[in-house]
């Protein structure tokens, strides 16, 4: 049972680092990519609107399709996140494409949260004693500490380091 708690703690810890790279540094990364403050505001607003409109549908996918598991949905989301962030990092794109890709990053990354809660409920159904509060607390700590450390990394290096932190934390999350 302790193994499941450690696994769940790690999932929460790493997810919130990934979330910090996308949400916590949205303005810095998008300014680095040439967007204005107004355009960044549009991106964040549209990301929130898309989340409101689509997150319930995405979190319901495993209920609609028998062979689709929450884990598979998360993997699919992360494939899109990898592709979107990689395109933003490696390719010089028109502003509108940068905006669309970052909107996808924002709303898709939030679609993972219901699945993280579902994992805890599934573990409890299996008879495991999962301390959800501890795991979420570690997630909050990881968000705060990664935000703090990335601030220094961005200052010492450049905003593209945000992508590298995203890739590393995402790969560890998926494993």
Where are these regions (language model features)?
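Helix-loop boundary and gating motifs at the non-cytosolic
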Residues: 1-52
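Hydrophobic core of transmembrane alpha-helices in multi-pass small-molecule transporters
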Residues: 13, 84-85, 95-115, 119
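Small-residue (Gly/Pro/Ala) motifs that create kinks and tight helix-helix packing interfaces
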Residues: 27, 58, 145-154
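Glycine-rich segments within core transmembrane alpha-helices of 12-TM secondary carriers
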Residues: 50-52, 130-150
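Helix-to-loop junctions at the C-terminal end of transmembrane segments
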Residues: 53-69, 154-155
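Structural signature of the two symmetry-related core transmembrane helices
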Residues: 71-87, 167
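Paired intracellular helix-loop junctions of major facilitator superfamily
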Residues: 120-131
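Symmetry-related core transmembrane helices of the 12-TM Major Facilitator Superfamily/SLC fold
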Residues: 161-175
